[in-house]
A protein has these predicted regions:
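Transmembrane-helix motifs of polytopic, lipid-linked glycan transferases
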Residues: 115-135
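Membrane-interface alpha helices of multi-pass inner-membrane proteins
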Residues: 46, 148-153, 174, 185-200, ...
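Short periplasmic/luminal acceptor-recognition loop of GT-C membrane glycosyltransferases, typified by
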Residues: 445-486, 519
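Membrane-proximal, lumen/periplasm-facing interface regions of secretory-pathway glyco-
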Residues: 380-447, 459-461, 480, 496, ...
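Luminal/periplasmic acceptor-recognition loop/helix of membrane-associated glycosyltransferases
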Residues: 471-519
Length: 519
């Protein structure tokens, strides 16, 4: 018999010499090819969905800051751009991202920024697909991460958070694989040094690590009881955990602002909790998903998909519970990031990444439990038999999903995807048309114009800063880590008086400038 027509045999543990015929090598090669095509379809769709016109405002003050850092070889420690808070401390943990963004912009303008953003989001999804659900068919993993990709691309703006999403995916993948390869834990301190100097959400890495430590401790204590899986023999010992944990703490301090930088996430958490009522009605991304859904209904595909993904992840815990199995690590992760996601729209993306991981890992564990149960009985495990009918059904499923993903990717090129998602955007690698007030900012920056400006939109203030800062300053911009709540109130009151034609706005401005130390 020719070699290519031979069938392979696999021995089932506990069955002695019993052999089971499985799919021949030729069919397996076809299966691998279709699985690769499926992953390529997902990553292609993710990249194309990510390439939408740039419409975030914060990128302009990020770019200006990066340019100034490269020109002056110095980092900001006090405010560079406003006259109302000119003496305020500025803990700018974004400086790493800002340098990268400024260099990218210098090399290829907005087009290259959008392409790099798409590449980073696609990398995040790729890490998720390859790192989670080791026991799952490729079709299921791609299906789950397709949902995640829709959520991520719905908020695919050029900001430091796109780096945080990728770092979060790497961190989660490292923690998942560290039980069998504890040497991977040594990668975390260097990653933390990079993360803490790019975005304040480096704290996500600490949250994930804390959840993992609690899980390891409880599984060690349970020794296979209480529905907790036994620890693998290769799991890191206490000495390694203490050393890595200490290095992570030190890594958080390796930033230009030392302990202020390490503790800066607490400032953000205050806005998330104590000051939530104030900021949620003034800043769109601080709005809760429930409030946003109440405003627009079912018109946002990305929000609907985020809700479906969360419900599936939550249901997977219930399904796992029917097998008397609990994962403390995944449970704590899900609760922590669900809390963040329910609080603010801006947190939907990291919550989606965690939900995707939880869903894949929970289903993967269910598959493994079923295999163990079947292997302990007289029947050959269903997953190992793979009858031809099931195999070809799976092939058809993979081909169908690939075609759908390629079709949805193509729909973004025609504009249909934008109408479906409610965003209305078409594939583009430039700025959103008539979105930024570049010409007005340049006009107001001409010689003879005032060196201080009041920009009625603190988003557009970033555009003014990009063209005219830091020699010309604005009353307030979108850097809520610099501009205080009191400044925000003065800003709103001044704009209201100006709109009403009340000259009393000048008195308010004078009072604000006096409080800010500006003469």
């Amino acid at each position: 018999m020719p070699e290519q027509n031979k069938t392979k045999s696999r021995k089932i543990p506990g069955r002695g010499s019993t052999a089971v015929k499985v799919i021949d090598k030729d069919a397996q090669d076809h299966s691998a090819l279709e699985s690769r095509m499926l992953v390529v379809a997902l990553l292609t769709a993710t990249f194309i969905w990510s390439c939408s016109p740039m419409m975030g405002f914060d990128i302009w003050w990020h770019l200006k800051t990066g340019q100034l850092i490269l020109e002056q070889y110095t980092l900001p420690f006090v405010d560079w751009f406003t006259y109302s808070d000119s003496e305020a401390a500025w803990v700018d943990l974004h400086w790493g991202f800002q340098i990268l963004a400024a260099a990218t912009y210098a090399a290829g303008g907005v087009a290259l920024l959008v392409l790099v953003k798409g590449a980073l989001i696609t990398t995040t999804v790729a890490i998720g697909v390859f790192a989670t659900g080791s026991k799952l068919d490729c079709c299921i993993r791609v299906g789950v991460w397709s949902l995640v990709a829709v959520v991520l691309t719905g908020r695919g703006i050029v900001r430091p958070e796109i780096l945080s999403l990728m770092f979060l995916a790497v961190w989660l993948a490292t923690m998942l694989r560290s039980n069998r390869n504890p040497k991977l834990l040594w990668l975390l301190p260097p990653l933390m040094i990079v993360w803490v100097n790019c975005h304040a959400l480096f704290v996500f890495g600490l949250v994930v690590s804390g959840c993992w430590i609690v899980d390891v401790g409880l599984r060690q204590l349970a020794s296979g009881r209480w529905g907790l899986a036994r620890l693998e023999e290769e799991t890191a010992d206490a000495q390694q955990l203490i050393i890595v944990g200490s290095l992570l703490a030190i890594a958080c301090l390796i930033n230009p602002y030392f302990e202020e930088g390490a503790l800066f996430p607490l400032v953000l958490f205050r806005k998330l909790s104590i000051d939530e009522a104030f900021y949620s009605v003034r800043v769109d991304e601080f709005t809760s998903p429930a409030t946003f859904f109440g405003q627009i209904g079912v018109r946002s595909l990305h929000l609907n998909i985020a809700a479906i993904l969360w419900l599936l992840a939550a249901a997977s815990f219930l399904w796992l519970g029917t097998w008397c199995r609990i994962s403390v690590f995944r449970g704590l992760l899900f609760v922590a990031f669900s809390y963040l996601g329910f609080k603010m729209m801006r947190n939907l993306s990291p919550a989606a990444v965690v939900s995707g991981l939880v869903l894949c890992e929970n289903i993967s564990e269910l598959v493994q439990l079923r295999r163990v149960r079947d292997a302990s009985g007289n029947a050959v495990p269903a997953m190992d038999r793979q009858p031809a009918s099931n195999f070809f059904t799976q092939r058809r499923c993979e081909i169908a999903v690939s075609v759908i993903l390629f079709g949805l990717a193509a729909s973004h090129l025609t504009g249909h995807w934008g109408r479906l998602t409610g965003l209305g955007d078409q594939f583009a690698i430039g700025e959103k048309t008539a979105w930024y007030s570049h010409e007005a900012a340049k006009f107001a920056g001409q010689p003879g114009f005032p060196a201080r400006a009041i920009v009625a939109s603190f988003g557009q203030a970033a555009v003014y800063e990009f063209h005219n800062g830091p020699t010309r300053r604005v009353l307030m911009d979108g850097r809520l880590e610099v501009c205080t709540r009191e400044t925000f109130k003065f800003y709103e009151a001044i704009l209201l008086k100006m709109e009403q034609g009340d000259p009393a706005w000048q008195n308010l401005l004078g009072l604000l400038m006096h409080k800010g130390g500006c003469q």
